[in-house]
Amino acid sequence: MKWLLLLGLVALSECIMYKVPLIRKKSLRRTLSERGLLKDFLKKHNLNPARKYFPQWEAPTLVDEQPLENYLDMEYFGTIGIGTPAQDFTVVFDTGSSNLWVPSVYCSSLACTNHNRFNPEDSSTYQSTSETVSITYGTGSMTGILGYDTVQVGGISDTNQIFGLSETEPGSFLYYAPFDGILGLAYPSISSSGATPVFDNIWNQGLVSQDLFSVYLSADDQSGSVVIFGGIDSSYYTGSLNWVPVTVEGYWQITVDSITMNGEAIACAEGCQAIVDTGTSLLTGPTSPIANIQSDIGASENSDGDMVVSCSAISSLPDIVFTINGVQYPVPPSAYILQSEGSCISGFQGMNLPTESGELWILGDVFIRQYFTVFDRANNQVGLAPVA
């Protein structure tokens, strides 16, 4: 009997998962639009989401660039704590980048005045460095320093974690941002300044039993979304997980067999590469096939630059099917048409990302909301299953 109890306790210990609740908030684009600031912002900032995946590096000064405008449409955010005692921050959990950064008390920019700021002097475990970091986004940049401290993530105490502390931030962009900073969950090979990503540090310290994390994004306007570190919760999906090999260990890059509509190939007919990215809200692809998709679904550009469709037409639009590793993943019009305050906006975006293996597609939140996603570092694979 004692052995049975012991085995039960061991099994239970191996299934411990750490969950970080994500809250769905109003995106920065929507906030700017409601305040009548979006048109002016778009005029001043030449948005180029592709720069997220091809940053410009200046190694001699340890300055790294990563465009912040990629987070213009983000809606899902979680809370972490940094320091001892912990100071709380709202961050984007981003599988399309690898660094952690938050505002600091050294920042006097307007954007920092209405966000949480980390104070190293209030933390007994903070360790400073002489390294600097700069994250650019067009006409301005976030500059700061790198330091080490304990990061609290969903009940995990991640000690000796390197992160960026901002000293200047571009007010015209970040002042209205619904988040304080970014927590990257991609591979360490794309980490700026060679900083160890949060999940790598967690795994290296033996703080989780499985070298993987998983994501569930709820369509609910408020709650229900979650990032799970070190485990998989089958209550969030139906059927079985289908596993897809990672083709390049940088971003979470996989092969897509084809993209079809009404049984006909509309893109990626001979296969293509895609990145599964929680830090991108839309489904993006090369401008030419995306333009064809927009035409097929009857989308046209409005004065804000959004591709809009008639809300009454949604029920008659077809699914768009992504075939991945031989399995079909339909995305229905209720998912790829985003409805907000009487407007219906296409969830597709054109973006050219040329690589040696061809143009990249980005499977952002529009896709991930439909499919529970496991990011398996141990086996370098992505698991997908329909959400429950």
From Swiss-Prot:
Keywords: Aspartyl protease, Digestion, Disulfide bond, Hydrolase, Phosphoprotein, Protease, Secreted, Signal, Zymogen. It is found in: Secreted. Residues 1-15 form the signal peptide. Residues 16-62 form a propeptide. GO terms for cellular component: extracellular exosome; multivesicular body lumen. One of its GO terms (molecular function) is aspartic-type endopeptidase activity. Shows particularly broad specificity; although bonds involving phenylalanine and leucine are preferred, many others are also cleaved to some extent. This is Pepsin A-4. The lineage of its organism: Eukaryota, Metazoa, Chordata, Craniata, Vertebrata.
